[in-house]
Amino acid sequence: PNAKDIYLIGDFNNWQMKPEYRMKKVKRFNGTWEIELKPKAMKHGDLYKLKIIWEGGEGERIPSYANRVVQDEVTKIFSAQVWAPEKPYHFRKKVFRAKTDPLMIYECHVGMSQQEEKVGTYNEFRENVLPRVAAAGYNCIQVMAIQEHPYYGSFGYHVSNFFAPSSRFGTPEELKQLIDEAHRMGIAVIMDIVHSHAVKNENEGLGNFAGDPNQYFYPGGRREHPAWDSLCFDYGKNEVLHFLLSNCKYWMEEFRFDGFRFDGVTSMLYHDHGLG
């Protein structure tokens, strides 16, 4: 709602603010902008961002609902990426019911679940780790660090892009294949989801999305978490609740996660963030 003007920029228009890519403000909705594009105006793999202009400033931002975000290997800059493969993944396991008597949970991190000194992938986890998890008698995995995050050392807890599976580990199709294979083995997949806070980063995340540092977060002293160096969502705003609840729905419907482990619940419930 704080934006004065928004342009869609990317590979398709040489990252320039062009009239045909200028977005329109929807008057009947507070703070909603839209754009109608010609067919094939954007293609699979194109990088893009929003150029947002506000009173006294401007900035390039990744859309909050972007479902694919990648980092340039040279510049290290993150951008949203159009993800519309010609052959999207189709789940083979149509119906899955987790065994919960008892539920044996194996907590894991895709990037760290391998022997080599590198970041592991969705495919490597599916091929090498899932069989060992099943052989050990577990019937559920709790997967960490799925949502995109700029700092790998945060273990995935400083999330910047809530709808984007981390591209460090591979593609969305490869994550879907991992979950599908787990279900085929009788293993439920729980996502370690982060809705208690967000990374401070402005260029990659939601920290100052349109010149309003409080658009998604509490104002004043409650905005920053005193221990995590991150920003706290304002759950009193319907728009924030819609954003987070739709995020849960997205992961369950698009990727078929079976449930969630919500990180930092005490911080969501208590004014002192559960720190005492």
What is the role of each PLM region?
Residues 4-21:
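Beta-strand-rich binding/interaction modules
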Residues 1, 10, 216-217:
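Short, Lys/Arg-rich amphipathic segments at extreme N-termini
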Residues 1, 18-107, 112-117, 124:
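The feature marks proteins involved in alpha-glucan
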